[in-house]
């Protein structure tokens, strides 16, 4: 853990609405969060220079139970932050750090917490404090909870608040990675910062594009976040002047068809327009995403766009049974966990006998039976 990050690779700031690290920390709901959590764990194992931004939800996503007639019941259970594996981030006065995020004509105040994911620092924002109104305290109550206005307030906190958090921490990175369009507004704040330093808008957006990466998970347009111009303008109306552009210019960055006043602002379109690299999460999904976003780049074929793919992976130590870990430790290179993309290391599997693999498989099968049989009986 004391080894310094690999300076030969670009440093990364990662933004996501959810992280699946452990069932103890209820800040995830499904695959998007599990991928993000594994991403941080793998970054730690491979000694990448990375930090991450997310939310510390008071209730997280709901816990599912079933009624006697088989209907789903959603239970929201409050987390006791004092019993979680998290640390308060302190300011220069020794008090818990607070980030002030502008909303309309007032500020929302977010506490900053840290989760140590191996070598990686995950900073979590929390608005459930007495400095905020009842409505703003609820911004970080539930993952994907509330109406569209609350969703926009969450995405402002993640994007704009996330960048302000890094600034307050004194952290600068080479690449800014949006895990889904929820974090797209990081590039609004980054453009504002560059313009405040004396750059023109055109210079600022090129710098932002060159250092931004957007990962899209959703395969259909209906799954992306769209905001009516009235609602979006209610909270974002003050930003165009700081960016050096007009309101229509900002809206057009989030439209498939710039100039169409009836089209809503799409976070995913904005992310595509302000990111040099966009990737789907499999080869097929990359192709689907090229078609889905094709209308953004008029006059180009879908395959000519900068939308590619990186196939989803998992964090090996998290998802491997202890028995398999012992087998790999006995036969694989000691650097296996730190260089899993090296095919030569994987060739060691051919040195493992069929008998040993079969024995391990049967041990796991018996373990599954021991788990599943009592569960089966309880439902009969």
Residue map of PLM features:
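A short beta-strand/loop micro-motif in the catalytic core of glycosyltransferases
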Residues: 177, 276-282
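Segments forming glycine/polar-rich beta-alpha architectures that bind adenosine-containing cofactors
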Residues: 15, 20, 24-41, 45, ...
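Single conserved hydrophobic/aromatic residue that forms the stacking wall/gate
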Residues: 369-380
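A conserved hydrophobic secondary-structure block that centers on an alpha-helix together
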Residues: 22-53, 132, 144-178
């Amino acid at each position: 853990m004391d080894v310094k990050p690999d300076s030969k690779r670009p440093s990364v700031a990662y933004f996501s609405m959810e992280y699946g690290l452990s069932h103890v920390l209820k800040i995830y709901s499904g695959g998007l969060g599990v991928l993000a959590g594994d991403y941080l764990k793998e970054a730690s194992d491979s000694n990448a220079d990375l930090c991450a931004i997310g939310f510390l939800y008071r209730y997280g996503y709901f816990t599912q139970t079933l009624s006697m007639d088989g209907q789903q019941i959603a239970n929201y259970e409050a987390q006791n932050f004092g019993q979680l594996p998290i640390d308060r981030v302190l300011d220069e006065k020794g008090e818990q750090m607070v980030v002030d995020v502008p909303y309309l004509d007032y500020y929302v105040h977010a506490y900053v917490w840290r989760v140590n994911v191996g070598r990686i620092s995950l900073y979590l924002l929390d608005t459930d404090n007495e400095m905020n109104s009842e409505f703003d305290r609820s911004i970080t109550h539930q993952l994907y909870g509330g109406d569209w206005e609350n969703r926009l307030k969450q995405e402002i906190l993640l994007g704009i608040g996330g960048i302000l958090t890094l600034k307050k921490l004194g952290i600068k990175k080479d690449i800014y990675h949006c895990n889904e369009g929820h974090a797209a507004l990081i590039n609004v704040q980054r453009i504002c910062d560059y313009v405040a330093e004396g750059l023109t808008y055109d210079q600022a957006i090129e710098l932002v594009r060159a250092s931004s990466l957007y990962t899209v998970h959703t395969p259909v347009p209906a799954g992306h976040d769209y905001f009516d111009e009235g609602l979006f303008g209610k909270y974002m109306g003050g930003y165009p002047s700081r960016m050096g552009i007009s309101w229509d210019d900002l809206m057009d960055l989030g439209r498939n068809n710039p100039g169409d006043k009836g089209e809503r602002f799409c976070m995913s379109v904005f992310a595509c327009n302000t990111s040099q690299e966009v990737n789907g999460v499999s080869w097929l999904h990359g192709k689907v995403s090229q078609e889905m976003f094709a209308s953004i780049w008029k006059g180009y074929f879908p395959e000519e766009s900068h939308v590619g793919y990186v196939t989803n992976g998992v964090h090996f130590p998290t998802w491997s049974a202890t028995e398999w870990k012992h087998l790999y430790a006995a036969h694989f290179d000691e650097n296996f966990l730190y260089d899993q993309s090296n095919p030569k290391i994987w060739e060691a599997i051919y040195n493992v006998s069929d008998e040993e693999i079969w024995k391990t498989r049967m041990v796991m099968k018996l373990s599954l039976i021991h788990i599943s049989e009592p569960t089966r009986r309880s439902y009969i």
